[in-house]
Amino acid sequence: MPGDLPYNHSMSNDFLSTDPYKGVRDFYPEDMAIQQYIFDTWSKTTESFGYERYDASVLEPASLYKSKGAVNEEIVNDQTYTFTDRGDREVTLRPEMTPTVARMIAKKQKELAFPVRWYSIPNLFRYERPQKGRLREHWQLNCDMFGSDTVAADVEIIALAHQLLL
């Protein structure tokens, strides 16, 4: 039929696969509508608590994760998508957002008015064995408050989490 592409559900030399990379998924329009509704709800709720949205590149220097120490050694050594780019730099697809937001806060700490309330809905990647309900690519809501170590700050985060569940 005119316009048909040489695709096949299975990999062979003559056809391209219609399956996504193992551990990730495609988002068709109906899936995107659901995801967008969830993200919009998260954003509206989080912003009602005074949090501002931020984001960053999915690529980070691999050293950012290696410097976190032995606590995350398994993630750094076994569960990251790390590669050497054309400039001979070791790069990682971010497996979590904490090192990235800490880097961003540190860079602008003299310009920021603390406490800082930021949130993100990052796309994250972990190279682990896909299993039911757990993929290599996922999104999550991160809500961070920097510059306050009070009980009130803890209560605020708990109240925010509670509101998100309603």
Regions found by a protein language model. Name each.
Residues 7-166:
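TRNA-recognition modules of translation machinery and tRNA-sensing kinases, especially anticodon-binding
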